[in-house]
């Protein structure tokens, strides 16, 4: 007869397989306590992650609003003012910020 894992000539009656738990109630309580502590740490980590994620979204929205305001100020300049300053719209960032705003709005 083969054993439980396909091992040849091993049977339960041989005494090699012991299904009795050697753990007492104290060991189970210690394991449960450790698992509760790990669960608590994971909950705390999840709360911190959620908080940081919220702050990141606020920062990204603030940055997007600042770029929109900056772009609006640039569009209020006449071409004569831009050439007098020696800077063009392309030198100040062009449409790269707009593309980033579009990606943020789309959620990518």
From Swiss-Prot:
Transmembrane segments: none annotated. InterPro entries: BBLN_eukaryota (IPR005374). Residues 1-23, 67-108 are annotated as: Disordered. One of its GO terms (cellular component) is cytoskeleton. Signal peptide: none annotated. Keywords: Cell junction, Coiled coil, Cytoplasm, Cytoskeleton. GO terms for biological process: intermediate filament bundle assembly. It is found in: Cell junction; Cytoplasm, Cytoskeleton. One of its GO terms (molecular function) is molecular adaptor activity. Residues 99-108 have a biased composition (Basic and acidic residues). Residues 25-73 form a coiled coil. Essential for intermediate filament organization in intestinal cells, interacts with intermediate filament and regulates intestinal lumen morphology. Belongs to the UPF0184 (EST00098) family. This is Bublin coiled-coil protein. It comes from Takifugu rubripes (Japanese pufferfish). The gene is bbln.
